[in-house]
């Protein structure tokens, strides 16, 4: 996610958010202040683009084992493109094993899941083939709430009634949300 530092063992494959014709990559180089200002000042619907299969494949290059964690499939095609990349990569690289995890969430909870994946990968007592099941179990016990300070972008994208968004702004109401079992914002 945004501002998540890439390292020797972690590669960020970013989503692209397009606002008023300007692309913002959701990676460590994202200028959050500029991004949020653009969202707030924008009067048109923004767009998001998930990473392509080729972008996932590039991130996998040279890996014998990899775990790919995506934003919820309830909001993005990232899981689908990552899973297709996994299938291609494993076919083209016999002996490789790729695990694709649908976070079923967005925001800070993804970082919590990512840290648990890292812990499991580094734990010599955990077999790589068991990581997928362990993460699935872990996700059932991990839930974070999201506070939306503005409904502006959701209203532009038709996910919230524009009158409700304006009323929330006038009354200075922050909305609390969470992800459903399917990974959709509630």
Predicted regions and their residues:
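Short acidic, glycine/Ser/Thr-rich loop/turn "cap" segments at secondary-structure junctions
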Residues: 68-70, 98-102
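Short coil/turn segments at secondary-structure boundaries
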Residues: 50-54, 149-150
């Amino acid at each position: 996610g945004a501002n998540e530092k890439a390292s020797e063992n972690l590669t960020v494959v970013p989503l692209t958010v397009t606002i008023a014709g300007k692309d913002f990559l959701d990676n460590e180089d994202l200028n959050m202040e500029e991004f949020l200002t653009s969202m707030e000042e924008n009067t048109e619907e923004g767009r998001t683009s998930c990473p392509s299969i080729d972008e996932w494949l590039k991130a996998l290059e040279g890996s014998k084992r990899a775990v790919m964690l995506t934003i919820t499939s309830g909001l993005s095609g990232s899981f689908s493109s990552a899973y297709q990349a996994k299938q291609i990569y494993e076919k083209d690289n016999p002996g490789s094993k790729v695990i694709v995890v649908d976070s079923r969430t967005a925001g800070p909870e993804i970082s919590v899941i990512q840290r648990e994946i890292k812990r499991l990968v580094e734990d010599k007592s955990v077999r790589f083939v068991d990581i997928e099941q362990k993460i699935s179990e872990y996700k059932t016990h991990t839930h974070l709430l999201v506070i939306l300070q503005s409904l502006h972008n959701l209203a532009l994208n038709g996910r919230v009634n524009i009158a409700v968004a304006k009323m929330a702004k006038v009354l200075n109401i922050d909305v609390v949300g969470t992800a459903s079992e399917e990974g959709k914002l509630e």
